[in-house]
Amino acid sequence: MPAPPLVLASASPRRDEMLRLVGVRFAILHGNVDEAPRAGEAPEHYALRLSEAKARAVAAMRPGHWVLGADTIVTIDGELLGKPATRDEARCMIRKLSGREHTVITAFTLFNSEQAKVIRQAVASKVRFKEIPDDELEWYVATDEPYDKAGGYAVQGKASFLVSEIHGSYTNVVGLPLCEVVEALKELGLVSFRGK
């Protein structure tokens, strides 16, 4: 019996592209979840909770399918940096990251409403930005790239020249820890590289 199909519970074009890059076949469907952090919630727990909520929301619409939910967050000095809504918020976030190291955590959950198994994992990467001169900061903020990105930047996009170091998984910083996700998909029989 063939493995049940995979559904990606995300509208992220970056997650879509990364999974396709390694030959994973999947459908895309995303649901709405409350993304507000809870008081005192640790960043890793927050990311794990959201990834599972996203997976469960879509699994309710696709019983019997494995659903992959993911969430990426950026933290510095214990502060969670979400997605900036305005140019001023983006400017403030990038300025806060300038010349400093921060943590990017991506959590993922694989869930099937008809199975007893749930796979959840959070992966952390450290990213250091160079000291960003005002003219480069203003140029980047004016590109409008920051607005749908945790921490206000896309490491694979126009902000790539701001990054001086990455320790850990690059794909995790992009939005999906591909090594860990593929291993989990292999464990569930949802992807195989034999005979390809």
Q: Could you describe each region identified by the protein language model?
A:
Residues 2-7, 41-196:
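Anionic-ligand binding patches
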Residues 17-21, 38-39, 60-61:
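Short loop/helix-cap segments at secondary-structure boundaries that form the rim of catalytic
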Residues 11, 31, 113:
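Cofactor-binding loop segments of dinucleotide-utilizing enzymes, especially the Rossmann-like FAD-
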Residues 23-40, 118-124:
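Short glycine-rich, Thr/Ser-proximal phosphate-binding strand/loop in the N-terminal lobe
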